[in-house]
Amino acid sequence: MEHKRESNLELLRILMILSIIGHHFVVNSGLPQLFSFDNITFNMVFLQVFGMWGKTAINVFTLITGYFMVKSDLTLKKFLKLYLPIKFWSFLFTFIFAITGYTIFSFKDIWKIIFSMIYEADVYYAGTLIVMMLLIPFMNVLARALSKRQYQLMLAVLLIYFTFLSTFMMRDTFDFTGWLCTVYLIGGYIRLYPLKVDNLKC
């Protein structure tokens, strides 16, 4: 069965990819360390704005994943389609950096790549994403079983815990894995209970 391509989501994906590239360019270039807030320049402001959307892009990608995956099942093929490219590029760049002298080769780095779920989960996106993917079958069962009201209450509790308490109560409640699962469930809610705009008038 063919799936209808949604051009608006494709465009959004492209914009988010560019946002992630911009974020890594600014953050990993070392330029932020040269910024002086005593002498704010146009270049400084431009780079700050240009590189500020990396986390937003991660949230958007997770939201889209929840939107499309909540009604489907995570198969081994789908999981490996995500997992294997991550490992391939991780190994490739590790060897390239070692060969070019950018980094020193270490078997510890290889070990960390193999067991990234242990070393990177809740720290780096790739490791956390793999953990979230493994939780998708369970989140889907939960999302489909809850009533609309129960689903809303669950999201309210999660959002209060991860955002309100840390923002207004100064509590360190944020957790990267938990947050990605929350955003996934928000995407699933949007898919299961879409906003009907047919009768809305401007």
Where are these regions (language model features)?
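Aromatic-anchored, glycine/proline-accented short structural segments
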Residues: T173-C202
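Membrane-interface helix caps and helix-loop-helix hairpins in membrane proteins
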Residues: F115-E120, F164-D175
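Membrane-cytosol interface segments of multi-pass membrane proteins
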Residues: M1-I160, N199-L200
